[in-house]
Amino acid sequence: MPSRIPVPRAPLAALIAAALLYGCASSGSKSKSDEAPPSSPLSGVAGRHMVVFPAQYLTTPGGGGSWDVTREGPSLLPILDEELADQLRKRGVNSNWTFGRELSQSADRNGGLAGDPRQLSAQGIRRMPAGDTPLPEPLASQIRTLVALTSARFAVLPIETRVDTRNGERKTAVRVLLIDARTARILWANDIEGPVSRDPAVVSEAMSPFGFRILARELATRFADLVVAQ
């Protein structure tokens, strides 16, 4: 598995903080917590209205260094959605965040007019970095329409979850994007890696519901630590 992409924290933190503060500028004067620089790139988002999209793609190693989307994704990725919601709620992130299941239910109540948050047209941006390049269509409109079902402007997209069980090891990572739905820009992108396990039972069960629950909890915990450290 490729190593985590290095992220220059100070510039990214400043960019995210500026975007968050700009998005809230019309709501009144800033509090001291708004003005303080965040201790991690995502530590400023916990108190905001946020959307966490359902996880999109589950991939395993393919030929020639590629990562292939697996057919187990639709059955296993909702487990990651549950774990992300659970870990963040344990840290006090509640009513101001809309998680994958709630967003899907809201979209379903709209009769499909808002699209399906579980099936975004996101295949082409799996490795897209943060920057000023806007998301392509129809993805930009899909995200904007779905986020508009909530009070949020910013969205977290767990776009790709990688599971590698080669060489008797279980290695995992989830690529997470922080998106400004209004401008369709990626503000932050990173590969969050889970712990490596060499336990034969853990390796063999990685793609079972039980084994995937374990690795999903590990990944969700590491992401939640970036939002609210424990």
How would you describe each model-predicted region?
Residues S3-R4, R109, N167-E169:
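Short secondary-structure transition/capping segments
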Residues G64-A155, E218:
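N-terminal segment of the mature soluble domain
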Residues A25-V51, Q56-G62, L135-S151, E160-Q230:
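C-terminal/domain-edge helix-coil "capping" segments
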Residues L21-G23:
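C-terminal motif of bacterial Sec signal peptides marking the signal peptidase cleavage site
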Residues S3-I5, D68, E72, L76, ...:
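A general boundary/transition motif marking the beginning of the first structured unit of a protein
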Residues P2-A13:
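Bacterial N-terminal signal peptides that target proteins for export
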